[in-house]
Amino acid sequence: MNARIRVAVVYGGRSSEHAISCVSAGSILRNLDPDRFEVTAVGITPEGSWVLTEGRPETLAITDGKLPGVTGDSGTALTLTADPARRGQLVSLGEAAGEVLASADVVFPVLHGPYGEDGTIQGLLELAGVPYVGAGVLASAAGMDKEFTKKLLASAGLPVGDHVVLRARDSTLSLQDRERLGLPVFVKPSRGGSSIGVSRVTAWDELPAAIELARRHDPKVIIEAAVPGRELECGVLEFPDGHLEASTLGEIRVEGVRGREDGFYDFETKYLDDGAELDVPAKVDDDVAEAIRALSLRAFTAIDCQGLARVDFFLTDDGPVINEINTMPGFTTISMYPRMWAASGVDYPTLLATMVETALARGTGLR
């Protein structure tokens, strides 16, 4: 019997967050303990093809502003069989079609955005009977869609910001909605992340272009009223015995950093231009920190999440407001989720090991 746990790290994918998924995977591959885990790296191209890759972390990093990616030339074409009788087998699609290239005890789907973080790969893994890290189908789908995240949180009595959803048939905001939301507003793809396709609108004549940009990524657009306040984050982690813990808080500061005036934490600020400062732990009063940790655990439960999540807040004069919940947060070297857990006394390799062990303990199927 293989003493090490066989982990298939799946990354890349078809969404606009393909490159960030690759960067997250590189960080995870670098930090999974080789004495405990036998790791296989599986990349998904932007077109949706699966390839067995070498999984070298140095090839999965942002270098001189250039984003990494998976191509058809990155490795051997393969697929994961959905037959539960062949549980976890990664099968060749090449000349030796059907040959088992590797097998996995657990899959770590480091996929951000649609076609990965939204319940799609989770459904495939459930069909295949393969345990996987992170949330199940329902929580992944709900957490990916900002509209339904807010609906579930609000139904649980949790504080969320005012917003309007534009479906594909809706061209713009009504006059009544504009008056209610006020300016500025943030225009976002409803099912997206990493601030891709997001605009800050400070005048209504900017709205059509912002909607058009968001719709390049998702026909459904969410328009959110600006919430003045500090940006705080909290990590939630499930342990193999099923209990949950909330991490030390982190804070993102953009306004006033390196001459920034807009306070908008966009894609370039997050990943390319070092335009934000991250404080871990966040400088907040103990009672505020405890309240936000409690809200994070409630939000995790409200969407029926499993495994892990990062819950994002605005801290206003009237108290915390939940912005969103990320069921597969970033795992890059600068990402807040592993940093918050490190500040909580859980180092990166231990964090990853806990997530894998929790996935194995949970298994698949109805639970």
UniProtKB/Swiss-Prot annotation:
Keywords: ATP-binding, Cell shape, Cell wall biogenesis/degradation, Cytoplasm, Ligase, Magnesium, Manganese, Metal-binding, Nucleotide-binding, Peptidoglycan synthesis
GO cellular component term of the entry, any: cytosol
InterPro entries, per database record: ATP-grasp, ATP_grasp_subdomain_1, D-Ala_lig_Van_CS, D_ala_D_ala, Dala_Dala_lig_C, Dala_Dala_lig_N, PreATP-grasp_dom_sf
Coiled coil (UniProt feature): none
Annotated residues for binding of Mg(2+) 2: E324, N326
PROSITE patterns registered for this protein in UniProt: ATP_GRASP, DALA_DALA_LIGASE_1, DALA_DALA_LIGASE_2
Pathway assigned in UniProt: Cell wall biogenesis; peptidoglycan biosynthesis
Sequence ranges assigned to domain ATP-grasp in this UniProt record: 150-357
Cofactor note: Binds 2 magnesium or manganese ions per subunit.
Positions with a binding annotation for Mg(2+) 1: D312, E324
Catalyses which reaction(s): 2 D-alanine + ATP = D-alanyl-D-alanine + ADP + phosphate + H(+)
Binding-site positions, ATP: 178-233
Matches recorded under Pfam families: Dala_Dala_lig_C, Dala_Dala_lig_N
This enzyme's EC code(s): 6.3.2.4
Primary localization class, coarse: cytoplasm
Single Gene Ontology MF annotation: ATP binding
GO terms, biological process: cell wall organization; peptidoglycan biosynthetic process; regulation of cell shape
Family designation: Belongs to the D-alanine--D-alanine ligase family.
Name used for this protein in its record: D-alanine--D-alanine ligase
Native source species: Mycolicibacterium gilvum (strain PYR-GCK) (Mycobacterium gilvum (strain PYR-GCK))
Gene assigned in the entry: ddl
